[in-house]
Amino acid sequence: MLPSWKAFKAHNILRILTRFQSTKIPDAVIGIDLGTTNSAVAIMEGKVPRIIENAEGSRTTPSVVAFTKDGERLVGEPAKRQSVINSENTLFATKRLIGRRFEDAEVQRDINQVPFKIVKHSNGDAWVEARNRTYSPAQIGGFILNKMKETAEAYLAKSVKNAVVTVPAYFNDAQRQATKDAGQIIGLNVLRVVNEPTAAALAYGLDKSEPKVIAVFDLGGGTFDISILDIDNGIFEVKSTNGDTHLGGEDFDIYLLQEIISHFKKETGIDLSNDRMAVQRIREAAEKAKIELSSTLSTEINLPFITADAAGPKHIRMPFSRVQLENITAPLIDRTVDPVKKALKDARITASDISDVLLVGGMSRMPKVADTVKKLFGKDASKAVNPDEAVALGAAIQAAVLSGEVTDVLLLDVTPLSLGIETLGGVFTKLIPRNSTIPNKKSQIFSTAASGQTSVEVKVFQGERELVKDNKLIGNFTLAGIPPAPKGTPQIEVTFDIDANGIINVSAKDLASHKDSSITVAGASGLSDTEIDRMVNEAERYKNQDRARRNAIETANKADQLANDTENSIKEFEGKLDKTDSQRLKDQISSLRELVSRSQAGDEVNDDDVGTKIDNLRTSSMKLFEQLYKNSDNPETKNGRENK
């Protein structure tokens, strides 16, 4: 069906306005998928977005941060590799905590499912603890973003300051603001926060010119989103979105983990649930088995020496089938059905109106998930996008739009939840309904509830229930200085203004006195400017530590190479060297190796001292072997030796 002239005209006017009003960014802008389980970074090269491989050569990076006993911070694959022996200080899936209160039901569930500590910060937020220090989830996210930033900088061979970062479509305001804070902590300017399904749609539809209605089913490591979009000649308009910010691969891992622990307890009578190292080994085996069962019908979970009792060591050897996995995780898969139906209803379409269904996120590879999607939409999902990379590629496209590299794409996203204020009797009065296109601005006139009232408290809520007690408080402020008047007389204009990131600004103005007040909502909690400044400084300190650590490793490598080369040369010319000179070199080699060994063991060793010993050994060896070379070429010396 062709779009109406009215819609066509509105779209084109909006497109022109957006282009003229947008500020182009002259520097490189990267696209980052900050995932619960894995993260990725991409850049636009010409007309094509490209994933950038990390230092380990991988296209995705585990969203894992660890702190070692030596005070070193590890990010990505190195952090994940040591998680079994350092589980309580290895932080993963912290995106599930970002922007959340400690008392939230989702947080309370997670506390018993992870080996590290989740603690209550002074502002009521959920933070994490490692090595007796606390970190906000935004700070941990910042460490992962920094890894992505460094990956891009190594590829581009220049500094990167700007990025587009993706978030789950169903993230609330506090979670979006916390994601921006994560970038600020490491000195990365997050120009735009883009919804993950929308980014995936960009990756899919960049080269599509024909009109389409698509559904993006995004089941990742920690969150589930479903979005319905209209794509028409470069315009990507989100019609509706729904989801669950606490449903993903981590939950599937937990279900399988619990099944393995239960099976082992039945067989041996031993409960492993309080053995952190064993639980971490089982968690990794569960994830591996889950992935394998997407491409094979059965596997074996094999964990030797998982524990021991008086009778000796115990092992886990457990055959496991795809059918078993599907039965265990059926309740999780079923939780995706209702959001899909709601999204279709909100978009005012039926499943038959959908042209293509995109599967995004690692969990969408599970055959049972694909079967569920097929039943919901009556068609097989499209294979046009890589589930692990589509979001980062879409972020890179939006980054290119902001930098001016791409000019024929317009993204019209929506707010996932309704926004409004508390009115008399605890009623939730909506100003902006869910699935409203953003940016968006809406004003409404309210009045006082009591005679003589000189101030009003504006409480801002997000949600879909009729009463505020059932919705989420995301901010509040007071408008004072209202002239006393009978109740219902003052005219107070409340305005909601949502930017393209989904960040909300709320203002209230007394139309008689022109007094006004406003708030940029960062949630009922969130990081203060002071906390962000402290974290920025900490990030810089870690940056210096990381640089120092790298320098120390490079210096140690140089020392080891020189010591080996010199040692080999001494052996080669043993009979021709003066014994005193030879012993002096050997002593210098021993002294250098001892210093390097102390440095690698974590002792306070000055790199300059190591460098000095390297220079001294190099100078001594060069002088000695130069003299040896001269002697070997001197006829008199040669003859003298022959005549003796």
UniProtKB/Swiss-Prot annotation:
Plays a role in facilitating the assembly of some protein complexes inside the mitochondria. It may initiate the events that lead to refolding of imported precursors in the matrix space. GO terms for molecular function: ATP binding; ATP hydrolysis activity; ATP-dependent protein folding chaperone; heat shock protein binding; protein folding chaperone; unfolded protein binding. Keywords: ATP-binding, Chaperone, Mitochondrion, Mitochondrion nucleoid, Nucleotide-binding, Transit peptide. Its main location: mitochondrion. Belongs to the heat shock protein 70 family. PROSITE patterns: HSP70_1, HSP70_2, HSP70_3. InterPro entries: ATPase_NBD, Chaperone_DnaK, Heat_shock_70_CS, HSP70_C_sf, HSP70_peptide-bd_sf, Hsp_70_fam. It comes from the Eukaryota. One of its GO terms (biological process) is iron-sulfur cluster assembly. It comes from Saccharomyces cerevisiae (strain ATCC 204508 / S288c). This is Heat shock protein SSC3, mitochondrial. It is found in: Mitochondrion matrix, Mitochondrion nucleoid. One of its GO terms (cellular component) is cytoplasm. PANTHER family: HEAT SHOCK PROTEIN 70KDA. The keyword Nucleotide-binding applies.
